[in-house]
């Protein structure tokens, strides 16, 4: 059966959307969505969405105090693990934490009452990747708020192999990407970003998708880099970005995740855009467009779109 949808999807006033398909076929969209935690939305077909309320909410004992951003959820050993960013009450610096739940609908509870790691700098946008050999990797952004390079504030991407607890690293994180391409420097010379990592494996190659430029600017866009190993070295595509503002009505498409269509025949990039394209801000909404790989291995996105699109639903 074919369904029709049109961007933006009915998930609004959010940022950094991540979509998970649960074993029962229900889709969960987690996002930056509340000042004190995270809400989720559910769907049976990726087209029709219903708000499910809070799935994680801070308490008086929580290590995170504010700025709850970019939740991602994975199913592992029968439980659901959420990695998220927040501002640490101890020092007001951004860190990444992990919470666990028995259901994708929560409630998620912090595994420990502290960030999952503290390397003395601000870190956000955690992403877990499971490789075919069973090894697990954690990607994140070293935030520009506390990373000054040659007088510029820069966000850099790192990776570390995870232990089985999904909480601790097997070794020191490795630097894998930093702003260097022309399109990544359009928000000005003093602040530059590589953030929002998401990794896919295709025909033995590792594709690191990421966003660059200021999130509340029209120039926020998605690029990617390729490697033969999950830890790099990653080489950025020469024709980046692959998702960017192409018409006045669409501003700042970025911070993506990827999900298969209900029938498994297509890959879909889920991302956010600014609600008001003429006044970009933290008020964003969810969009979704097809993506894929060319014969030469290069990645493409058919978007951003704002006209009706068809999607293949689960088989009858």
Residue spans of the language-model regions?
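Carbohydrate-active catalytic/glycan-binding domains of CAZyme proteins
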Residues: 1-316
């Amino acid at each position: 059966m074919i369904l029709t949808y049109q961007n933006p999807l009915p998930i609004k006033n959010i940022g950094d959307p991540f979509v998970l398909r649960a074993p029962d076929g229900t889709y969960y969209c987690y996002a930056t969505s509340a000042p004190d935690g995270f809400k989720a939305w559910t769907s049976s077909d990726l087209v029709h969405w219903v708000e499910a309320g809070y799935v994680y909410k801070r308490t008086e004992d929580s290590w995170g105090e504010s700025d709850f951003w970019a939740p991602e959820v994975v199913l592992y050993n029968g439980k659901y693990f959420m990695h998220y960013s927040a501002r640490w009450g101890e020092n007001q610096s951004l860190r990444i934490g992990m919470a666990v739940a028995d259901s994708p609908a929560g409630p998620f509870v912090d595994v420990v009452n502290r960030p999952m790691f503290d390397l003395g700098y601000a870190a956000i946008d955690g992403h877990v990747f499971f490789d075919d050999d069973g090894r697990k990797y954690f990607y994140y952004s070293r935030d520009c708020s506390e990373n000054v390079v040659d007088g510029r504030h820069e966000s850099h991407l790192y990776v570390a192999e995870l232990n089985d607890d999904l909480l601790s690293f097997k070794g020191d994180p490795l630097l894998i990407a930093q702003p260097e391409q022309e399109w990544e420097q359009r928000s000005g010379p003093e602040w530059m970003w590589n953030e929002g990592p998401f990794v896919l494996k295709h025909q033995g190659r590792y594709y690191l998708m990421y966003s660059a430029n200021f999130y509340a600017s029209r120039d926020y866009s998605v690029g990617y880099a390729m490697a033969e190993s999950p830890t790099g070295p990653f080489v950025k595509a020469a024709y980046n970005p692959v998702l960017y503002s192409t018409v006045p009505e669409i501003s700042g498409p970025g911070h993506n995740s990827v999900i298969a269509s209900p029938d498994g025949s297509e890959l879909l990039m889920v991302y956010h855009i600014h609600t008001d394209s003429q006044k970009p801000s933290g008020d964003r909404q969810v969009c979704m467009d097809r993506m894929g790989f060319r014969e030469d291995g290069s990645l493409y996105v058919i978007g951003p779109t704002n006209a009706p699109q068809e999607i293949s639903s689960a088989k009858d």
